[in-house]
Amino acid sequence: MNYIDLSCPAELFRTAMPTEEIPAATLTLFNRSDRVIVSVEVLLRLLDEDGGETERLAYRGRALNGRPHSTFLLTVPCAPSEGLKALDVSVEKVWYADNETWRRDPANAVEYTPNALPVSPALTNLKYAAGETAVGYPSMQNGLWVCVCGRPNPEGEPCCARCGRQMETVFSRFTPEAVETQISLRERQLATS
């Protein structure tokens, strides 16, 4: 299970572990808002292979240029180690160019199960049907719908906050059955060509 604060304007999109060459965790964040983000404070937990916390770092990145509806990078200095296997990142506070702020409220966190598929023929077929941003089949979960791109959204939201796909389209075109139908149709088209 994972947790997400659906109100957070800076969504964690991707992480890169620290290495000897780059002794820092590189976080790719997505600015969901209509305003420029200039600073982000994160809490970074470094985890071992059993999920145990080996280190905890609070870091504030400044002079960022998080353009609206775009990705931007935040580099958190930390040394690599042999036991480091994963990162757990929590966005704690966001500063906008207009001096407004957003602060995480633990009461807003909602639990969800990620839908990411492992590298497999099923994922390849899904990417054929839904595009390269697809990570897993959509699902409905306790007041949320998880998009094909992996983003949880409130049940009443008609469009995904990350990729903009409509919920109706996601659930009609990208279920396992719908993807299989698309693949079968394409195979028949190729066979008759």
Question: Positions of the model-derived regions?
Answer:
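Low-complexity, acidic Ser/Thr/Pro/Gly-rich terminal tails and inter-domain linkers that flank the onset
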Residues: 1-32, 36, 41, 49-50, ...
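Hydrophobic residues positioned within well-ordered beta-strands of beta-sheet architectures
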Residues: 25-27, 40-42, 57, 72-74, ...
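Hydrophobic beta-strand positions
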Residues: 29, 46, 94-95
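Cys/His-clustered metal-coordination modules, chiefly Zn-binding fingers
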Residues: 105-193
